[in-house]
Amino acid sequence: MAWRIARSAIAACAVLSGLMPAAAQSVEEFYAGRTVTLIISFGAGGLNDIAGRLVAQHLPRFIPGRPRIIVQNMPGAGGLVAANHLYNAAPQDGSVLVQLDRSVAQSGIRGAANVKFDPLKFTWLGSLSNYDNEAYLLWVNVSHPARTVADINRLATPTRLGAVSGGTNMLMSLTAKETLGLNVKVIRGYVSGPAVWLAMDRAEVDGQTIGFTSVMAEHPEKWENKEIRPLLQFGRATRLSLFSELPTARELAPTPEARALVEFAELPFLTSLPYVAPPNLPPDRTRPLQAAFIKMSRDEAFIADARKRRVELSPSDGDQIMAVLRRSAAMPKKVIEQFNAILEAQN
């Protein structure tokens, strides 16, 4: 009888150990020899892709076990496709990470269509830029007649701005139109940033909204050869010194209500190029990943490589990202509803 009880106990222990392999593994054991997938939520060629591949190259050195990281591009709906995939379909063990568009988390907070995740439950590792040394700009081709942002409203025909559906450039272009009252027409439906650049080259559109770092990483020759002209700054409370002659969107907001909408729209810039792991990741795996991201962002080799690829760095950690998301979620309901109305009116 005692032998049968002992044998049953041994069998039960074997079953339980088979059900809980992760609990018996250290972080180093989990990642050693493993291939981690980093999903980039946009197509190849743009700043998101450039920065994502930079992180995939350097981050393994700082993760215990030094896993290999491969890149997978998963564009769609301004980053929502990748976010929904990570939250609902990807392995939840830390073997899949995602670089999201900065606007995706706020899309979840404001209850945008097709959102199937709670951004506050993602495991935020950090972001590469808080926009301290950056500006998001409204650009036009140099052949366009507008020399200043005020000129846009003096023209008989709207200035056509190309945009990726659901992306930051769509959100900022609509903010310029509906909140600042600029005479622009937002041409959506482009699948990627490179497609918008091509549309500008072909004169299908007159311009777009895009960050200065993106311009310098993707098409520095357009700035250096004066092929494009900046007219307006987004993402900043004050003017970036490089563009001291250009007004900020907040300066042009005609009413306190409009300024509140602009400030809400600009909050995601504080968490640009963010990286996330799945929700409910165990703390013993979360902390090493978050620490690895920050160590990487301070590493001399990483910084030098980022400079070479023209990726502007002003990193934030996961806690700082969560603070921005909570700030966004705490905005007055009326502001969020007004912002949603601006976007929904264009659908």
Where do the language-model regions lie?
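N-terminal secretory signal peptides that target proteins for export/translocation
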Residues: 1-4
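Bacterial N-terminal signal peptides
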Residues: 8-18
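Generic structural signal for hydrophobic residues
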Residues: 10, 55, 172-173, 289, ...
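Sec/Tat signal peptide C-region and signal peptidase I cleavage site
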Residues: 20-24
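Conserved hydrophobic/amphipathic secondary-structure segments
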Residues: 25-272, 337, 344
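An extracytoplasmic/periplasmic, membrane-proximal ligand-sensing/linker region
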Residues: 32-36, 225-226, 252, 260, ...
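Structural beta->alpha junctions
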Residues: 43-44, 278-282
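A short beta-strand structural signal in non-transmembrane regions
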Residues: 272-278
